[in-house]
Amino acid sequence: MEYLELNGTKEGLSAAVDDMWVLNATYLVFYMQAGFCMLEAGVVRAKNAKSIIMKSIIDTAIGSLLFWALGFGLAFGNADKASNPVIGTSHFFLINYQNLSFFAFQWAFCATSITIVSGSLAERVHVTSCLVYTIVMSAFIYPLSAHWVWSYNGWLRMIGFNGIIDFSGSIVVHIVGGCIGLVGTYLVGPRIGRFDSESGKPKPLPGHSITIYTLGAFIIWYGFYGFNTGSTLGISGGGIAIASRSAVTMTIIACASCATTLLAIKIKSGKYDVVKSVNSLLGGLVSSAAVCSLIDPWAAFIIGCVTSFVYLGCSHLLIKLRIDDPLDSSAIHLGCGIWGALSVGLFSTQENLSLVLKKSTNVYGLFFGGGFEQLGIQLLGIIIVMAWCFFCASILFTILKKFHLLRIEPTKELMGIDIDSAGGPAYQWDN
C-alpha cells in the first residue's frame, strides 16, 4: 500500500488500519506452525519427535523461500487484470509488487497447507522426501489451486454468478494439504506394526505425549482466529462485521464438533477419547474456514455436529482401508474440508453472502431457497482441486518411491528417525 500518497487523508488511515489488521492476522496464522509442530511431536513416539520437528522447520523455511520466489507470482500474478485464468505470470520474487501485507498473509496460508502433509507421513519417510514435496507444493501445486479459487481472474472464481467461494481456505489450504498427505501415506504404506500381518486388524501405536498434542491443538485453535477473521483483508467498509461473524460461527462449529464426538464416543464405549475429541475440534475449525462468514450461528451449530460424524466416518474408513495416517490428517483436513466447502452451497444466507461479495446476489444456500447453483459450483471446485492434487502427488511420490527416497529402511524405522537423521534423540535421559 502506497501510504505516502495517502498520507494525512481518511483513505490513508483506513488503508493503514486494514493492513495492520491483515498483518496481525498473519502473525496468528504463522503461530499455527508452532501448534502443528507440537501436535505432530506429541502424536509420534519419542524416538521420532526430533525428526518431526525438523521437518516442520524444513516446511517453513524452504517453503517460504519458494513461495516468495515463484509461488506467489503463480497464484496472484496479474490478479487485477483479465489475464490468464489458469496461472499467474508476474510478481515473482515480489518484483514491482506493493501490497506486502497481502503477500505475508498468503505466505502463512501456504505454510499451513504444506505442514499438513508431514503429519500424514510421520515416522517412516526420508527427510529428503519432505524437502522435495515442500518445494513442489509451495512452488507449483498450492499456487495453481490458489489462483483458480482466489485470484480475481481464476477460472473457478469466474464460474456462475458468484463463482466458487472458499472464504478462508477449506479448499485451497486444507483439501490441498489433505489430498497430498493422503496420496503420500497410501504410497508409503503403514508404519511397521500398525496392522497385524495376519488379520489386518489395527494395533495401537500411541504417541509419546498427549499433553504436547493437546497443547498444539489449542495453539492451532488460537491461530484460527487470525486464519478466518483475517480473510476479510481489512475491517473498513463492513469488514469488522464479517470478521466478528466469522469468529463467532467458527467457535460454535469447533465446539459443537468436539462436544458431539465426546458424547458419541462416551455413549458407544463408556469412556471419553481425548485424541478423537481434539481431532474433531480441529475438523470443526477446518470446516468453518470456507463458510464462517456466510452463515448464522444456529447453522454453525448444525455444521459442527455434522462435522463430528464426517471426521469419525473418515477416520474409520482410513483404518478399514489400512491407510496409516498417524494424525488423521486426511480425515481432518480432506474430509472436513470437503464438508465445509459444501456447506457454503447449503447454509449461506443471501444477506451474508451479499455482504462478503460486496454485491447483491440471488444465488446462495440451497436450504434458504438459493437454488442448486452454488452447491454445484462448490462440488465442481472440490472435484477439480482434488483431481489436480491427486494427479500431482501421485507422480511426485511415485518418483520418490522409485528412487528409494520415500521410505526409510525398516531397521532405521524401528530404531527411530531421530538417531539416523536428526543427530540423536529429542530427549536426553540421565544415567
Swiss-Prot record:
UniProt xrefs under InterPro entries: Ammonium/urea_transptr, Ammonium_transpt, Ammonium_transpt_CS, NH4_transpt_AmtB-like_dom
Cytoplasmic side, ranges: 41-56, 123-129, 184-206, 268-276, 320-326, 400-431
UniProt-listed Pfam families: Ammonium_transp
Subcellular location: Cell membrane; Endosome membrane; Lysosome membrane; Contractile vacuole membrane
Any one GO molecular function term: ammonium channel activity
A Gene Ontology cellular-component term: endolysosome membrane
GO biological process per UniProt: ammonium homeostasis; ammonium transmembrane transport; secretion
Keywords from the UniProt entry: Ammonia transport, Cell membrane, Cytoplasmic vesicle, Endosome, Lysosome, Membrane, Transmembrane, Transmembrane helix, Transport, Vacuole
Main subcellular location of this protein, as a coarse class: membrane
Transmembrane regions listed in the UniProt entry: 20-40, 57-77, 102-122, 130-150, 163-183, 207-227, 247-267, 277-295, 301-319, 327-347, 379-399
Membrane topology: Multi-pass membrane protein
Extracellular side: 1-19, 78-101, 151-162, 228-246, 296-300, 348-378
Alphabetical list of NCBIfam families matching this protein: amt (TIGR00836)
Family: Belongs to the ammonia transporter channel (TC 1.A.11.2) family.
UniProt-listed PANTHER family: AMMONIUM TRANSPORTER (PTHR11730:SF6)
Reported function: Ammonium transporter that mediates the excretion of ammonium from the prestalk cells from the slug. Controls ammonium homeostasis during growth and development. Ammonium has been shown to function as a morphogen at multiple steps during the development.
Protein name: Ammonium transporter 2
Organism from which the protein derives: Dictyostelium discoideum
Lineage: Eukaryota, Amoebozoa, Evosea, Eumycetozoa, Dictyostelia
Gene designation: amtB
